[in-house]
Amino acid sequence: MGDLWLFLLLPLSAFHGVKGCLECDPKFIEDVGSLLGNLIPSEVPGRTQLLERQIKEMIHLSFKVSHSDKRLRVLAVQQVVKLRTWLKNEFYKLGNETWKGVFIYQGKLLDVCQNLESKLKELLKNFSEIACSEDCIVVEGPILDCWTCLRMTNRCFKGEYCGDEDPRKAENREIALFLILLATAVILGSAVLLFHFCIFHRRKMKAIRRSLKEYVEKKLEELMGKIDEKEEKDFRLRK
């Protein structure tokens, strides 16, 4: 009953969740789950959890590869089918071997996953180099967008499918960068002007204080002179 619940849930999760090249066909995920289920005897403890974990790792591997680089997004449907067939054959080979325990099984399945990752990366990279080149070679059959699971009839690609940036996004980034530079220039200019204003104001205040001091000293000298003259006159009158 646990296996049945797991296999019924897989197509639903594949439909609603993120995609990779291999899981665009929900039937393929069911087949993988069924093949993996045949590899593990029913008496193995925690069999359902083990199956669920292995299937999730397999699905995540396909997603991880196709989303690791913007250029690893499109692939010929024919190549996807061949890759799925290869993976099923690997599972059939494991199924024909004698069961030697969970750890041996996980080790062999890890080898299959590593080979699958390597093959998928190589196929996506080679196809991208051809489909995104200026003199791209015509590819027969439909092309699969591994991110959306849409089939396309395009033979050559450019823009986001080849890792090139969206012109609008690039333009918006340039505008944002210009505004940032402009704001930085305004702030720096204002700081320089404020600095010069403070220096000029400080010098001006020093000059004013100096002039005021000289003026006060001069007036004091004049006042002291007048006082001395007055005292001298008073002294003479007393005589």
UniProtKB/Swiss-Prot annotation:
Family: Belongs to the Izumo family.
InterPro entries referenced in this protein's UniProt entry, alphabetically: IZUMO
GO biological process, one term: acrosome assembly
Keywords: Cell membrane, Cytoplasmic vesicle, Differentiation, Glycoprotein, Membrane, Signal, Spermatogenesis, Transmembrane, Transmembrane helix
Originating species: Homo sapiens (Human)
Subunit structure and binding partners: Monomer and homodimer.
Glycosylation sites: N96, N126
Function: Plays an important role in the biogenesis of the acrosome during sperm development.
Record-given protein name: Izumo sperm-egg fusion protein 3
GO cellular component: inner acrosomal membrane; plasma membrane
GO MF entry, a single one: protein homodimerization activity
Extracellular side: 21-174
One Pfam family it belongs to: IZUMO
Gene of this entry: IZUMO3
